[in-house]
Design a protein with these regions (language model features):
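Beta-hairpin "wing" of winged helix-turn-helix
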Residues: 26-33, 37
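Short glycine/proline-centered loop/turn elements that form peptide/ligand docking sites
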Residues: 6, 13-16
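Arg/Lys-rich, alpha-helical DNA-contact motif
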Residues: 2-8, 40-127
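Short, hydrophobic-biased segments on the C-terminal half of alpha helices
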Residues: 17-18, 49
Length: 127
C-alpha cells in the first residue's frame, strides 16, 4: 500500500509517517517509480507506535518495541529491551503518581484548615 492508504488505515497523517521514516522507525521500501511501499506489518508497527505514544512514551522510547516487532515477535513487549523500557516508564509513572498524591494531600489539608483571619478577600462585583 502507498503512504496515503497506510495513513488512512492507521489514522495518522502522511507527514507523521514521513517523520517516523526520518527517525528510522518506519523504513519505507520504494517502488521503481519512487513511491513508498508499505504492508500490513508496517500498519502493525504504526499502531504500536501510536499506542505507546498515547501511554506517554517518547518516539525514541518506542524504538525497542518497533525493533522487537521487526524481529518477528508477535508483540512489541516480547523482547527484553522493550520490557526494560516498559519497566523504566512504569517507575516514572509511579514517581509521578507519588508527587501527585503529595500535591493532593497538601491541597486537601489546605482546604480542611480554617482560613487565616487576614485573608479577607471580598469578591468583585461583576456587571
Amino acid at each position: 500500500m502507498r503512504i496515503g492508504e497506510l495513513g488512512d488505515r492507521a489514522g495518522v497523517s502522511t507527514r507523521t509517517l514521513r517523520h517516523y521514516e526520518h527517525l528510522g522507525l518506519l523504513p519505507a521500501r520504494r517502488r521503481a517509480n519512487g513511491y513508498r511501499e508499505y504492508d500490513d506489518h508496517d500498519l502493525r508497527v504504526v499502531a504500536e507506535i501510536r499506542s505507546l505514544v498515547e501511554l506517554g512514551f517518547s518516539l525514541e522510547e518506542t524504538r525497542p518495541f518497533v525493533e522487537c516487532l521487526r524481529s518477528g515477535q508477535p508483540t512489541g513487549v516480547s523482547c527484553a529491551a522493550s520490557r526494560e523500557v516498559q519497566r523504566r516508564k512504569l517507575a516514572e509513572v509511579d514517581a509521578w503518581l507519588g508527587r501527585l498524591h503529595s500535591v493532593r494531600d497538601e491541597l486537601a489539608a489546605q482546604l480542611g484548615a480554617p482560613p487565616e483571619p487576614r485573608c479577607a478577600v471580598t469578591p468583585r462585583e461583576t456587571t
